[in-house]
Amino acid sequence: MSTLPATDTTLLSSELKLVHRLDQRFFALLDAIAQTGSINRAASTAGYSYKGAWMLLESAGNLVNGALIETVTGGKGGGGTRLTPAAVELLAVWRELQRRNLEFLHRQETWLNQLPALAGLLRRMSMKTSARNQFAGVISAIDTGPVTTQVTVTIAGAQEIVATMTTTAANRLKLRIGSNAIALIKSSAVVLVTDFAGFSLSARNQFEGTVSRVERGAVSSLVVLTLPGGACMTASLTNDAIDALSLAVGQTATAVFKAYAVMVAVQQD
């Protein structure tokens, strides 16, 4: 079984913690999936619950603009789960980054410890947020008005998410067309529609997809919608709403949310 390099307890974990929660533990999960062919066993190995592993894989897939795992059916072992080529490449890059940075930190440990400003910068490079939906993309359009500004972020599958913010906020973020950005939407802001009944909605953001997972809770549930480009949109609904819509895996539904519900994050210079 392959093993991942050990992580440094200070700067290395911060420097190599990629966007969202793509850290040593996450890549240990990918490595375990590659070794076991099972999300359940891999989650246990990496210290995740089964549900937590699924949610992290879906969220991370949005940030890297592609699915990280795929299901294999049939065969001698009866099928299972394996990493997609994108995930295999990501895991290989992570290992190489770890190797190079471990070497660097071991050579320069004393020097780095004398530069607290640099250490702080490395730690700030990893953003943490409670928003369930996080989509990495590129700013493709900016419509600036005297009071509000509309920003379009193009994500996987050429899907466009429109965000509305104050022009003051847009200026503060120094938004530019072609810049990388992350669109964040809380799951509670997403409405699922299964039948428009001939009506049109005013909400700017409407994404049709397929229900890929329903996680029922005591009162409310999470519904994951897979979009044509492979991104996953999560909506938080009451159990009564799920029953009323008769939501089930494989069903087509449309995720709807207002432009005002979208937050945009960009890396500052």
UniProtKB/Swiss-Prot annotation:
GO terms for biological process: molybdate ion transport; regulation of DNA-templated transcription. Coiled coil: none annotated. It comes from the Bacteria. Residues 128-194, 200-266 form the Mop domain. Keywords: Molybdenum, Repeat, Transport. GO terms for molecular function: molybdenum ion binding. Gene3D superfamilies: 2.40.50.100, Winged helix-like DNA-binding domain superfamily/Winged helix DNA-binding domain. The keyword Methyltransferase does not apply. Belongs to the ModE family. Involved in the transport of molybdenum into the cell. May have a role in the early intracellular capture or metabolism of molybdenum. This is Molybdenum transport protein ModE. It comes from Herbaspirillum seropedicae.
